Amino acid sequence: MLVLLIVFFNSYYTHCSHHSLYSFHCTPPDPAMKQSPLHRPSRPLLALGIEGSANKLGCGIISHSPSPTGGPTLVMVLSNVRHTYITPPGEGFLPSDTARHHREWVVKVIEEAVRKAGVRMGDLDCIAFTKGPGMGTPLQVGALVARTLSLLHNIPLVGVNHCVGHIEMGRQITSSHNPIVLYVSGGNTQVIAYSQQRYRIFGETLDIAIGNCLDRFARVIGLRNDPSPGYNIEKEAKKGKRLVQLPYGTKGMDVSLAGILHSVEAYTKDKRYRSWDQVNDVEEDIITPYDLCFSLQETTFAMLVEITERAMAHVGAKDVLIVGGVGCNLRLQEMMGIMASERGGRVFATDESFCIDNGIMIAQAGLLAFRMGNTMPLEKTGVTQRYRTDAVHVAWRA
């Protein structure tokens, strides 16, 4: 693999399969707010980000440029390429198999990202990679490639916390200033608020993450993993007609989801349950897979809305930013929107290009850290599977 990288990265690159150019102006600071210590760049800065903490392998290139008019920094997404490891229905993804996928695709994904951005490796100011949290062996693939590129081209390295990447990309795209953040994905469920250069965790799952809960139930009822189990649950939930009783596990601002998963799985052994090929319009007292998808979503999402509202009340926030793969779910956005509007606030969310794991969010967070002078020596670039969100010093925010 190292030989492939050396041969490949000494050449010039340019196109990729699916990409749009995004351009954003940073929102001008409110004079009443504390001023960010982040200075405007004196020249265009480029960062390449590599993400591979789970089954998504992503690479993106972002630029931060001074505004020609002297206004806020201009942020441009130059490329955002992703390849997903998809397993057969009923199967999850193992770390070793996922790492094998990443090793097979990493050169191709980076090649597409660099070619699409229309830049050379020598143009980059820093290389950012996901340091954690995530699955160990897939994380190591991204870190190894980042180190190799750094050594080949003498480019500084920045290790990025996966969750902070989600938050910073979400803030950039939506122009949300200081919302409560609901971070919901396959490996994480956290309610977060910013304070004193840390993203503070106010509540989280006590056992499994919401995305893991949905994915595991999708496997039980035989849903496909393409494009993702959670998306397929969302689609089938729209056909549900019956809300079955499930335990409701909120504890303060924390949630417990393992018991709900066990309970909804138990309904598949109920004598009233009819599998996909047995559903008909004749029987009345039946439970269908559609009903279970609907019930699981409604119950778990109600819990997420409740703990988010508690955090909002605690810190006096009006707005919510939903990040992470489950944040793409339109029903979750709708339920959160109802709650936020009742409090006179708003919900911010992104589309699948940015809410699902991607390399551009790592590039964004990495470039923010780089602009504050934060880089990593090679010996500090090991991965951290349990890298807490609140362990990161967010030096670029006031």
Swiss-Prot record:
Which positions in this protein are listed as binding a divalent metal cation?
H162, H166, Y183, D357
Gene Ontology molecular function, alphabetical? chromatin DNA binding; metal ion binding; N(6)-L-threonylcarbamoyladenine synthase activity; nucleotidase activity
**A Pfam family this chain is assigned to:** TsaD
Q: Where can this protein be found? A: Cytoplasm; Nucleus
Give the cofactor note: Binds 1 divalent metal cation per subunit.
Read off the InterPro entries from this record: ATPase_NBD, Gcp-like_dom, KAE1/TsaD, Kae1_archaea_euk, Peptidase_M22_CS
UniProt catalytic activity: L-threonylcarbamoyladenylate + adenosine(37) in tRNA = N(6)-L-threonylcarbamoyladenosine(37) in tRNA + AMP + H(+)
Q: Which GO terms describe its cellular component?
A: chromatin; cytoplasm; EKC/KEOPS complex; nucleus
Q: Which Gene Ontology BP annotations are present?
A: positive regulation of transcription by RNA polymerase II; telomere maintenance via recombination; tRNA threonylcarbamoyladenosine modification
Task: Describe its function.
Answer: Component of the EKC/KEOPS complex that is required for the formation of a threonylcarbamoyl group on adenosine at position 37 (t(6)A37) in tRNAs that read codons beginning with adenine. The complex is probably involved in the transfer of the threonylcarbamoyl moiety of threonylcarbamoyl-AMP (TC-AMP) to the N6 group of A37. KAE1 likely plays a direct catalytic role in this reaction, but requires other protein(s) of the complex to fulfill this activity. The EKC/KEOPS complex also promotes both telomere uncapping and telomere elongation.
Protein family per UniProt: Belongs to the KAE1 / TsaD family.
Task: Specify the protein name.
Answer: tRNA N6-adenosine threonylcarbamoyltransferase
Question: What organism is the protein native to?
Answer: Cryptococcus neoformans var. neoformans serotype D (strain B-3501A) (Filobasidiella neoformans)
